[in-house]
């Protein structure tokens, strides 16, 4: 469901019913948070966000204390407000196509670029700003030119690095903003099934109770992919498989990449291998 369509006057007029909420968002990762943000900023719809994990400041992996995985359910690394990326290094890539992600599959490139610019503004609003890379565009272009001589293509991306130590507090600020705008956020509550009436989503049943709503946005994230697949099959929705990218860790001495990474924080080089003709790339440098 496009959250934008829920902000139209006609929808708002009909949304005032005896339902518990106008919109229920399942999952409070990036997709769920941004859906709720768009709705509360552009409408007065009653929005409920349900997240099976915890609040950002309550997410803590016990492996940090005991050096052993306790297989917590739900996992604090993968589940909770902020999604599976809460404890990442907070690297923001402002580009419409990267790896398997290509926004131009869903919209024209100018529209995708406008959406990326809007996304950056929202991140900045909650303090998710940082140094912009490449720090020297001329040097970055020179690196790309040199790489091409060896059959290597460098993708120049506008990047920002937030840092894993700062990301949780910024996501907390975003969640608090949603609450202040009237969005209801439930944590440690798992959606079990979707209620459907007359071919339309009518609400959800959770580990606590049942909620009714005129619209349901499913954004369960990486940890909810299998559940999402089962829901899609249950209601006859089409499913497609995307290719996966398998990575290996290669360590080199800091002196080798330091000069490059001072200009480009996370350089993405593409190489078409000669032996098996595989399309490979570097990431998380």
Please describe what each predicted stretch is.
Residues 2-4, 9-99, 138-285:
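Residues forming the flavin
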Residues 80-133:
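Dinucleotide-binding Rossmann-like beta1-alpha1 core, especially the glycine-rich loop
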């Amino acid at each position: 469901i496009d959250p934008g369509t829920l902000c139209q006057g006609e929808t708002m007029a009909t949304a005032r019913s005896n339902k518990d909420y106008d919109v229920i968002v399942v999952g409070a990762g990036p997709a769920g948070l941004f859906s709720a943000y768009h709705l509360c900023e552009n409408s007065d719809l009653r929005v409920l966000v349900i997240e099976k994990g915890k609040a950002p400041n309550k997410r803590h992996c016990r492996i940090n204390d005991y050096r052993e995985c306790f297989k917590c359910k739900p996992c604090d690394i993968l589940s909770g407000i902020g999604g599976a990326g809460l404890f990442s290094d907070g690297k923001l890539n402002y580009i419409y196509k990267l790896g398997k992600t290509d926004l131009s599959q869903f919209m024209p490139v100018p529209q995708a670029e406008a959406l990326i610019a809007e996304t950056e503004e929202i991140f900045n609003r909650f303090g998710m700003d940082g140094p912009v890379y490449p720090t020297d565009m001329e040097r970055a272009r020179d690196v790309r030119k040199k790489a091409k001589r060896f059959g290597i293509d460098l993708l120049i991306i506008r990047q920002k690095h937030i840092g894993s130590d700062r990301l949780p507090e910024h996501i907390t600020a975003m969640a608090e903003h949603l609450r202040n705008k009237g969005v209801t956020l439930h944590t440690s509550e798992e959606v079990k099934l979707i209620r459907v009436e007359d071919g339309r989503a009518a609400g959800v049943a959770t580990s606590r109770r049942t909620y009714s709503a005129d619209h349901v946005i499913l954004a369960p994230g990486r940890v909810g992919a299998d559940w999402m697949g089962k829901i899609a099959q249950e209601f006859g929705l089409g499913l497609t498989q995307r290719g996966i990218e398998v990575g290996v860790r290669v360590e080199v001495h800091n002196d080798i990449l330091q000069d490059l990474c001072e200009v480009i924080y996370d350089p993405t080089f593409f190489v078409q291998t000669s032996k098996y003709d595989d399309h490979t790339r570097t990431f998380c440098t």
